[in-house]
Structure formats: C-alpha cells, structure tokens
Amino acid sequence: MNRLNSRSLRLAVLVIFIVGLLLLALGGYLTPLFRLTLNPIITVEAWLSSRYLAIHDMITVPKDVARLQQRNAELESQVTQLQAQVIELQQRISEAQVLYALLDFARSRPDNQYVAASVIGRDTNPFISYILIDQGSDAGLRHGMPVVTNQGLVGRIDAVTAGGARVQLVTDSASVVNVRLQSTQVEASMTASVTGELALQMVPTSASLSVGDVILTSGLGGSYPANIFIGQISSVRKRESDLSQTAIVQSVVDFVGLKAVLVITNFKPVDLNPLIPTPAK
Amino acid sequence: MANLIALPLLVILSVFQTAIVNRLPLLHGTADLILLTLAAWSLHERVTSVWFWVLLGGVLVSYASATPFFAPLIGYVVMTVIARLLRRRVWQTPILAMILITFLGTFIQHGLYMGALFIRGVTFNWRESLNLITLPSLLLNILLAIPVYAVISTLAEWVYPGELEI
C-alpha cells in the first residue's frame, strides 16, 4: 500500500514537473536558459556543417566544374550555330529585299518579260566593266539582251553559256548608249571612261543641259528599249570655244554593290552592222 | 603530278579571283591571283612544269574575261620568260625576285590590257589609267606577293621534293 502511494506520488511530482517546465517554456521564462545551452551547440554544429560542406565541395566540385564546362561548351556551340543562322537569315532577308524590289519593278512594266539572275563575279581585267551572272541560254538569255535593275539600266548581255552569261555594263569604256533628256527631249550618246565615269558626249551647245536633268534610254540604234532610267546629270562642261558640250552623268545604279539583275528577254536588239557602209577598197 | 594539280588549283583561283578578289578593288585596281601564282611557280628552282601552268592560267582568265584572248596569255608568257631568266641570276633572293616579277608582270599585263583597248578603238586617259588602275593594282599585287610566294613555294616543295643527303 505504501509502495503504491509512493509510486503515485512520484508520478504526480513528475507530471507536475513536466507540466511546469512546459508552462515555463511556453511562457518564455526558459528562453535565456535555452539560449545559453543551445548556442554553443549551434555554433559547433554550424562549424561542423561548414567543414563538411567544404570537404564535400572539395570532393564533388571538380565533377561539377567539368559538367559546367561541358555545358558551357554545348551552349557556346549553340550560340555559334544560332549566330550563323542569324547571319544566314539576314543574308536571305537582304537577298529577298533585292528580289522584292526587282519584282516590283517587273510588275510596274508588265509589257516586258524578265529573267532574274544573281551576280556571281566580275571581270578580271580592271580596265573593263563586265559582270558574270548565273543564268544563261538555258534560261532563254541571248546576246544583246538588255539588263536592268529596279533602279535603272545596267548593261546588256555580251556572251552566253548554258548556265551563265557575261554582261557589259554601261560603265564599260567600250559601251555606247543612246539617251535622251526627259525634260528637254535632247538626244545624245552616253559613253564611259575606263574608271566608269559616265558622260554625255557631243551634245550641241544649243541644247540646254542642267544639273539634275533625268537621263533615259532613247531606243535609237535598237540596242536598248526606250525609256529606261539611267541617272541624272551631275555636272556640265561647256566652254564658249567648243562646238559641243559634255555632261557628267551620275548613274542611279550602284554598280559596285550589284547583287541581282533582271534580263529583259522579249527585247530583240537590232544589229545595225550590215547597214553601216564599209569603205570601198 | 604538277600538271595534275594545276587544273584544280588554277580553276579554284580563277573562281576566287572573279567572285571575290575582283569585288575588292583599291580605287579601280584589283589584285591578280593567277599572275602571282604563275610568278611564284615560275621562280621556284625545282619546278619544271611551267608552261602548262601558264597556258592553263591564260586560257582560264581569257575564258571568263571579255578581254581579247591573246592579252592575258601573252602577258603571262612574257612574265614567265622573265621569271625563268631571273631565276637563274638572282635565285638566292627569291623574295626580291618575286617582287620584281610582280612589278614587271603587272605593268606588262596592264600594258597589254591598254593595248587591247586601244585596238578596239576605246579612247582613254593614260595618266588616269595609271593612277587609278595600274598603280593600285600594283600595290595590291605586291602586298599579296609574299604570302602567295610562301604558299606556292610550299606547294612546289611538296610536288618536287628535294633529294636527301646521306
């Protein structure tokens, strides 16, 4: 009986002690005590944890670095590929813009039939101005056909193979184009120097030439169709003592950056050579 | 062997010349890779197959160009004759010989080009042609002469390996 009472008493004291501790803890009265006892433990645990992580990193980081380097290489490769794609797409956009401009030009003149061609090269001889294009007799190109861009006259076909052609530019020193001034209807011949400078030669002094006058093909001679835009007069050379005057023409076509051209395939140039009298021997 | 590699090499150089080099002018002058290649090839002491290269180079350039057929070919032949003569005299200083041949070759070639224009009845200003076309072309050719010589010399030594001394 005494033993039973003693146990009950201990249990009751224990419960009261635990409940008391809980109440003290919940009431915040044990916080300084907890702080005092837990802080060293936390410090030790933090130190231990940092040492563990340092050792863990030392063991595992090389693998991560290798993986990161591999990933970096992959990403750099992807960036390079994407940059190449961007450049290719920009180039295609540039080509498409040129082709759209040519298409607009072709639509504006529905009476002409065109074959579009890319410029693939230039003549080796720097004294002459010829370009090579990637369309030839297989595409219906023939000798003498006029070549234009959306900006204006480029030249005419000089030689043709099955898959390519050579174009004599109007800036070639042997090229002669019969032209007229849009404003005054004055007709003249346009020639070029070896450096590609275009000039109207032998224009009568009575004709009125002024800077800014628009030059078009006249169609005379049968080499080019009429009314193709060539350029504008940029300066006039006229002296009182001369029998004729000369004008420098600024072409609207950028012959240096020429990328694509249109060949007018339904124009048949007239060969006037048989009509030119030869001196009797 | 030398003749076998001449065709692909000169065709590639012709394509490179018309597609790229001619689009990179200095004023109005352009470099002539075929001329430089033939000059470097002709100057190499062990090279024997020269005339086939010259003929092929002249034909390729003439085929793509609107220049009369004889002009590039004659220019290359004359330049090669001078190069072969020079090789025997100043072979100890091949770089100097290369620059000299480039200088002479450019003037010979451009003289023939101007002659061809003259025959066709084209009037042109000699001084303008010299200042704006020939001299810039000469400068470009001389700038490219040394690297072209180095490449072609390596090729020539590969095609014509020297005898080993035991």
Residue ranges of each PLM-predicted region?
Chain B
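Terminal, non-globular segments
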Residues: M1-I166
